[in-house]
Amino acid sequence: MPNWCCNELAVIGKKEEVERFYNSFKDTNEFFENNIPTPKELADVKATFSKTPDSEESNRLYEKYGATDWYYWRIENWGTKWDISELQLTEEDDNGEGNLKYYCFRFDTAWSPPEEGIRKLSELYKDVLFHLQFEEPGMCFEGFYKCMNGIVLSQLTVESYTKIDQITDNYIEEYELSLESQKEENNIINNGIEDESV
């Protein structure tokens, strides 16, 4: 039985994209499997708990998927071995104008926060800010992880109970700042300008 990591995920962005994300799993609670599915060929392979391929079939799977079984594939692509557990929708709001939507979820994951899965979700749902806060009391660590459009905006992991000061209460403002930052970064990239101060 694993240690459980407690997660809170705030998702904010354009109403259509945020609702598309919510609708992808609301009936099944298969948060990652419905968006970043485990390759069918690996789903039935018994976990070997060894990263070293030891057979021709293992070598073939590793070449094709970067993993020899479902366990290592999920660790690499979701950041956790199982999909989420104990999902709760804790908040739902908008900006009052009908164009932005905000959801906040609580859920558990096995052993660790699903950072890579959240980053990959942010690639699938454009201009949506994913802000994950987590705590793993068994191993005494906590932190946060923010990303948008597949780019990690900020992250921090510390020993538990040191109190994270960076937690925000205003997700709408945070979303607008993150979107503006993304636009500035895209302008720099598109114009071929490198900012040496970053």
Range-by-range predicted roles:
Residues 1-198:
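Intrinsic low-complexity, intrinsically disordered or marginally ordered coil/linker segments
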